[in-house]
Regions:
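Periplasmic/ER-lumenal interhelical loops and adjacent helix-loop junctions
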Residues: 1-63, 465
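Transmembrane alpha-helices and membrane-interface helical segments
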Residues: 52-63, 85-88, 115-144
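Extracytoplasmic
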Residues: 165-378, 383-386, 476-479, 489-492, ...
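Secreted extracellular polysaccharide-interacting domains
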Residues: 379-398, 433-440
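Extracellular carbohydrate recognition and processing domains
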Residues: 431-467, 477
Length: 515
């Protein structure tokens, strides 16, 4: 598995040589567009190194024009600096993505462990140091060769002044950002009001902390960023309690372990890989932020936990591992009760809470496939192409403009697949594009079953009479196949039920009783 962002976090000539972020470079923002450059792609070398680069390139071109080919490699009279110059120049070109951006992206598959270096813009850093050293070295020798005349001295002084000026802007106001402004983090004795709950609990009774809203960042495939400042609160609690956490904010995390943790926190499915995976039967501590930004499955965890303490910003609950099974059985019983209701309306094998069919449900059983999820077929297509999940009108006869899209996707435990992008285009009766929505699968996982995941996304329409075109694409997977099944589009006010006897689907979520 390789980390994402090899070419995304690359440098550009303007992010290396132009003074963006400097007071004397503010005018550039009105001239050049730089919104496509990620912050990790910036490594401004400074005015001195920029001028030195132009000068040395001029020398190289002059020698080439004069056919002094043997002298081209000699920028200075110092052999070591000449070697460093060419090495730093090669490193700079690599930071730009050369040669891969020249239509040779396929070569990335053959560079071995170098591909593990996610942000290649960092390869511009050697150029920053070497070019500044080389420029000052050349000016110093020029000054000495001119018998220390005024012009050479002035140019060298200006170059040194600009290096110092750029160095100042590099560190200006950095001190404030490095100061620790979190008393709770440096509280050694847990005396801070936000930490006093740690003194009131026997922490040895618990195996880990589960933060809610849940967050998990770092697998390069799943991105659940949490809400309500839960990340800071969680890591302060981890540091002061000594307990591990099921939340993650790391640069590299096992994808399979990520899916295991995510599957435990999201809606329970029929294939519970997590019921017996915990090392002990000790309970968990739920760290629950006081906000409304929680998913229904997170609220279920809270409902089946016992409140034990609180602070000014969050509540603490105790959750026993057996609660995961209890929650699944409870949800199954509730769905069975709803499914058995006489108030539901039947449309072939589908039951809904609305009397008129105002949903679209696509099973793709006519597209026979040996690797289908449910039934006899599924939708599949090459990842690099746009696979159309749905095209047509929105479900009719509904007054709301808020809709819910769910679908199942395969290979969720395989590298790169969760990075698939979903695009929703809305067009009017004349074919004019009204709105476009994009979202990654990695942020919308709501249920995991084996190597499959249920993706859910809620969106608003400009007008119910408009047409929808929903597609999926993953260019980095190229010719690999991506597969989808059971695509459901419904108004948020309508519930849809399907059953095959032992399993019931409510709004595309899978429910069954545990053994």
């Amino acid at each position: 598995q390789y980390p994402w962002g090899f070419l995304y976090y690359r440098a550009y000539p303007q992010s290396i040589f132009l003074p963006f972020g400097r007071p004397y470079g503010r005018f550039l923002y009105s001239i050049l567009r730089i919104d496509y450059i990620d912050w990790e792609g910036y490594a401004y070398v400074g005015l001195t190194a920029f001028a030195g680069t132009l000068f040395f390139l001029y020398i190289l071109v002059s020698k080439f024009v004069q056919r002094k080919y043997r002298q081209i490699t000699s920028i200075t009279y110092n052999r070591q600096l000449n070697i460093l110059f060419w090495a730093s120049l090669a490193s700079l070109l690599f930071s730009f993505g050369v040669p891969f951006i020249l239509g040779l992206e396929r070569l990335i598959d053959f560079i071995g462990p170098i591909r593990q270096m996610r942000g290649i813009a960092r390869f511009a850093w050697p150029f920053f140091y070497i070019m500044n050293i080389l420029t000052i070295y050349w000016l110093w020798n020029w000054w000495k060769s001119k018998d220390k005349n005024l012009i050479a001295a002035s140019v060298t002084t200006v170059a040194l002044f600009m290096i110092c000026t750029d160095a100042y802007y590099n560190v200006r106001n950095k001190g404030k950002s490095l100061e620790n402004i979190m008393p709770a983090l440096t509280d050694q004795n847990n005396e801070d009001p936000d930490n006093q709950w740690l003194q009131r609990l026997d922490l040895d009774r618990y195996q880990a902390i589960i933060p809610l809203p849940y967050f998990h960042i770092g697998s390069e495939n799943i991105w659940l960023d949490g809400q309500c400042d839960i990340i800071n609160k969680t890591f302060i609690s981890v540091k002061n309690s000594g307990l591990p956490t099921m939340g993650s904010l790391l640069s590299r995390t096992s994808l399979n372990q990520t899916i295991e943790n995510v599957s435990a926190i999201t809606a329970p499915s029929c294939k519970n890989y997590y019921l017996n995976r915990y090392p002990t039967e000790m309970p968990f501590l739920l760290l629950v932020a006081r906000c409304e930004k929680k998913y229904p499955h997170e609220k279920e965890l809270i409902r089946h936990a016992n409140w034990i303490d609180s602070t000014g910003v969050f509540d603490i609950y105790e959750l026993h591992p057996k609660a995961f099974k209890i929650i699944q059985d409870s949800l199954f019983s509730n769905v069975v009760r709803e499914y058995s209701s006489v108030n539901l309306h039947k449309f072939r094998d589908i039951y809904t809470t609305y009397s008129i069919r105002n949903f679209q449900f696509l099973t793709f059983d006519s597209l026979l496939n040996d690797t289908s999820f449910f039934g006899s077929g599924c939708l599949s297509g090459k990842a690099k192409n746009r696979t159309i999940l749905y095209t047509g009108p929105v479900p009719s006869d509904d007054t709301t403009r808020t809709y819910n899209l769910t679908f199942w996707m395969s290979n969720i435990r395989t590298d790169l697949y969760p990075r698939t992008m979903i695009t929703i285009n809305e067009t009017d009766s004349l074919g004019n594009k009204v709105n476009t929505l994009n979202f990654p699968v990695s942020k919308q996982i709501m249920q995991v079953s084996g190597n499959k995941a249920l993706i859910e996304y809620e969106f608003h329409l400009a007008d119910n009479s408009n047409q929808l075109n929903i597609s999926a694409q993953n260019r980095i997977l190229r010719n690999n196949m991506i597969q989808f099944d059971n695509i459901l589009l419904r108004p948020v006010t309508t519930d849809v039920y399907i059953s095959d006897g032992s399993t019931i689907w409510k709004n595309n979520f899978c429910y069954c009783k545990t053994d």
